[in-house]
Amino acid sequence: MAVPARRTSKTKKRMRRGHIKLNVPNLQFDAATGEYRISHHVSPKGYYKGAQVVKKSDDNANA
């Protein structure tokens, strides 16, 4: 059975676990829509760098 030869110190344990963390998304305030969006991504309303680049289609009109 595999058993550690020596006890792992607090420093070694913490160094190993140093990269285990949650990543916070980089949010930017979009002045065109007044909402927050992820950097370098189109906002949910279709705006990028203050200009509308994607026109939202109205799915309810076809129903």
Curated annotation (Swiss-Prot):
GO biological process, one term: translation
Keyword Ribosomal protein: yes
Residue ranges that the Swiss-Prot or TrEMBL entry lists as coiled coil: none
GO MF term set: structural constituent of ribosome
The entry's keywords: Ribonucleoprotein, Ribosomal protein
GO cellular component annotations of the record: large ribosomal subunit
PANTHER family for the chain: 50S RIBOSOMAL PROTEIN L32, LARGE RIBOSOMAL SUBUNIT PROTEIN BL32
Recorded family membership: Belongs to the bacterial ribosomal protein bL32 family.
Name of the protein in its database record: Large ribosomal subunit protein bL32
Protein's organism: Lacticaseibacillus paracasei (strain ATCC 334 / BCRC 17002 / CCUG 31169 / CIP 107868 / KCTC 3260 / NRRL B-441)
Name of the gene encoding the protein in the UniProt record: rpmF
